[in-house]
Structures are given as structure tokens and as C-alpha cells.
Amino acid sequence: MRKLLLSVTCAALMLAACNTPKEPVNPSVLAALDALPALVDSCGIPVLQYCYFSPQGELHGLVQAQDTTFDIPQPVTEESIFQAASLSKPVFAYIVMRMVDRGEIDLDRPVADYTDIERFEDKGMARRLTPRIVLSHQTGLPNWAAGPSSDEWPTSCITFKYPADSCFAYSGEGYAFLQRAVEAIQGAPLDEIARREVFEPFDMPTTSYDWQPAYDTLALVGFNRDGENRGQGRHPRANCAYTLRTNAREYARFIQHGLLNGEGLSDAAHKEMFQHQVHAQRYADEPRACDSSVFWCLGFGAVEEPSAGAGEYYWHWGDNGNFKALWLLHPGTKEGFVYLSNRATGHDLLDPFLKELTGEDLPLNDWIRN
């Protein structure tokens, strides 16, 4: 296929080589991508990497802010690697559903049947947690018992904020608990499992939950809101909730093939992943208007489309502080989009960009940030 260079605005430099789709792409998508350089520059995002796919083909590229004060020692290319943060979780959920298909784990059997619960203060409550409850964030646990990259975390005491299975409560700690069960069942570490179940089948050679030697030059540094270089941010251990590193094109393959098409899953497991499990009121004690149309499935969110009759969007965001990410999938049109960025301002463009991309006033920015 011939290469197409997307337009460059004076506000930012776009270095993009994109596969030309087989048929014309929705004009709103082209307009949204055309607006990215100005948005990236106005938000002060050093690098944003993206991939859009549809039945017509794929558009992918990266945008660099014109601001030259961002000193990035690594080469910036479409192969550059970013922290995907919580985009780690849907990949793990897909792995769990493959295990469900094989009868290796039961969605509604206690996770405690597969691994120990020694870190839990309330062991009776811990025994109520099932993979379904974990994947849909209904554990009642805090996000983390301690900083997950700290030396203290592996032995920290886990306490409940709410009763198990009583409300939506976003928790990386719950996912890490289920990770221990998956590793015990498989008799292998997380990244080895993920490579076999996801990365190799979907052609994701540079994606990993662990630090890889190639990341020394491929992994970009991240910047805080003050524009300070905070480094690549190496993590001490693989964690299914937040340590995934990838690039936009590789992650888009997972969304398209694993989630949209359900490749590697039975029809029943694929359908089950997309079922609403809980109304995702972000803060259990503080209902907000933006919560009303957001739900959680097995591993990712769903948001009802404001326009009647057009179906739902499915999504997940990632936030590791100085790295921000998001993906959006619309099964009705078989379109998907993912972006990765390397500054704490990486979500500042969400409202105008998603409005341009979808034509909808999706409440994702308010839900994530407020």
C-alpha cells in the first residue's frame, strides 16, 4: 500500500506514515487526526502515538509538540515504547477469559481457591472475591494497599474500603490478587503467560509487562506537568494492573483481534466479556452526573452513546502519572482508536478530541479526572 503523510500544522510537527485505507475513512476521523497536532501542542504533550482502525483499514502515526524544551534522549518513532499504565488490565482480563474457556478457572469460584489470602486483614471477606468480581472492580478494595512499585507492597496488609460485591470500586490490588491465582494455575510468571496467550498470537513482539533490554533505547521518558523529565520509570516486578509497555499499533492489534473479533475466545466467553457487570459510579459515596452512562464489563468500561440507536463505546484509560493513555472501541462500526502519551498532561485533550472523533459528548474525561 502507498504511504500517506497526514497534514502538518504550524503548531506541531507530525511525523506520520499511514496505511491508506481501502475505502474512504469517515471524514470526522480524518478531521480529528488533522486536529491532533494543534491539540498536542496546546496541551504540551512531548509525544503522542496513535492508531485508528476500521473495516476500511488503518491510520497510525505519532505527533511531537513543537516545543523543543522537551529533551528526549531516545529516538522518537512509531516503534517507540510507552508505559500503557492501566491498559494493562484488559489484556489480563482477556487472558483470564481464555483460561475460563479451557476450564482452568471459574469466573464465579473464589479466587482464594487458587491462591493464598495471607495479605488480607479480613480473610472471610477475601474468600468472597471471584474473578468476575475482580475484573469488574467490585472487590471493595482500595486501588493499592501501598505503592505497587515500592519494596513494602508485596507484604503490605490489604484492607477493604467497602464490603465485597457491594459497589464499583476501582482496584489494581484486586487485579494483582487475581494475577497471583493465574500464575499459580499456569505455573509461570505473568509475562510468559501473556506472551503465549496474547503477544505472540497478535504480533506484539515489543509489548511486555516486564522490562526488556530493547527498552533501553525504545522506551520513552515521561514528563510531569512542570515539564520535568522523570525518566523511563522502570518497575521492579510485572503487574497485570499497570506495568504493560507497548506501542499504539501493537496494542491496537489486541483491541481489534482479541476484543472486537474475539479471536482466541469462544463465542460465549467473548459475549460475556462485553456484558455490563456493574454501574460504574466512580466514587461510591459521591454520585456524579458523568457516572450515569458508564458501566463496567469484564476488564474494561462501557459508555452509552448519547445518540439513540448507535450502540455503545467500550474503553479503558491509563494513568501512570507521567504517562497517559486511552483506547476506544465501537463494535457497531468496528472502529477502534488507541493513543499513548508521555506527559502528565496527556488527557488534557480528551474532550475536544473525542468530540471531533465520535461526534458525541462522551463523559469520559469528567469520569476519569473529576
Identify the residue ranges that each predicted region occupies:
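Short, conserved catalytic-motif segment at the N-terminal edge
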Residues: 30-82, 104, 151-158
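Short, well-ordered beta-strand elements
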Residues: 316, 324-343
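C-terminal motif of bacterial Sec signal peptides marking the signal peptidase cleavage site
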Residues: 15-17
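Sec-dependent N-terminal signal peptides
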Residues: 4-13
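Short active-site loop at a secondary-structure junction
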Residues: 43-46, 71-133, 161-173, 239-242, ...
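Bacterial Sec signal peptide processing site at the extreme N-terminus
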Residues: 19-29
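Short, gly/Ser/Thr-rich active-site loops of penicillin-recognizing serine hydrolases
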Residues: 278-285, 309, 343-370
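Short, surface-exposed loop or secondary-structure junction motifs
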Residues: 68, 122-320
